[in-house]
């Protein structure tokens, strides 16, 4: 079964064509600068070669149409006919409280996703444009929506509810939703598969650490808690997002700096986090270079970043009454050994006995980085959200 996975953002469309159930990647790439001058499609050939194809793509339907044409292209493609594509799976960011599982996309589902647009005003409209584009370009093909938020619908009310006026929260849908759910679901299940553990009887902490970052507590196969909240700003310090901050600071700054709501939103989403503290960059590779050159603010930013992760690991271990597996994933989690080491150092009291030597040589592959005597297994699992979306698509449509 060939499944095309689409992840449509406001100015990008990422895609992967997978042969299921094995998960072999037949084609992958993405459109960038969609709707802007200089838009292009970057694709990865089977031999790893990167190819850039420039084309004016003012909107999503034209971008998806170009992707489909490249999939069938004699030089760059891998299929002879669009009929070879059996189904399309979409990343849908926000399903609110309406979706606790992946679903086949119908007019009723589209209407419910549209109702969630106020909760994700940038993402949901873009996601739906991909659905509409496929309906137009491949009429009759079945489509499945996989929600970032669905995995966390198992959180109990005392976890997802904020300590704000009860009726006001209900009126506006204010609660913890969590994001990166597809990634947390994949790496937690994959870790148990690698380690030979029963997913439904294991306490797992998953750390999805990249430019955006979140930590989840997964107990006996169900999400118990997650650091991201109603929006993707809460929790860990991120590339440009603040993470946890005293809400009173925001009202103080509104008065002190003369900021309106839009200004505060830009501050905590785009000007804070690692970038805001370091004054250097939101890219951890550039931060590491700055640290080597003696930049004190870059050093401070990195120390804060690592500390926040460690604090959440401890909190979630307490919330679950212990932990059996700690998983690192995401761009930083998979590739930056220094962050993994800082998080896991001096954690013997919690059952973590870390193997610094193995950790230092480990980048971007599945690997246990704790010692055999460690009561908590620490493991790196590269995330594969596209495989998870394709897997859900196959399961639902079978």
From Swiss-Prot:
Reactions mediated catalytically: acetate + ATP = acetyl phosphate + ADP
Binding residue positions for Mg(2+): 7, 385
UniProtKB keywords: ATP-binding, Cytoplasm, Kinase, Magnesium, Metal-binding, Nucleotide-binding, Transferase
Localisation: Cytoplasm
Free-text cofactor note: Mg(2+). Can also accept Mn(2+).
Cofactor: Mg(2+); Mn(2+)
Main location: cytoplasm
EC number(s) per entry: 2.7.2.1
Pathway note: Metabolic intermediate biosynthesis; acetyl-CoA biosynthesis; acetyl-CoA from acetate: step 1/2
One GO term of the biological process aspect: acetyl-CoA biosynthetic process
Highest taxon in the source lineage: Bacteria
Binding site residues for substrate: 91
GO CC terms: cytoplasm
Biological function: Catalyzes the formation of acetyl phosphate from acetate and ATP. Can also catalyze the reverse reaction.
Family membership: Belongs to the acetokinase family.
Name by which UniProt lists this protein: Acetate kinase
Organism: Porphyromonas gingivalis (strain ATCC BAA-308 / W83)
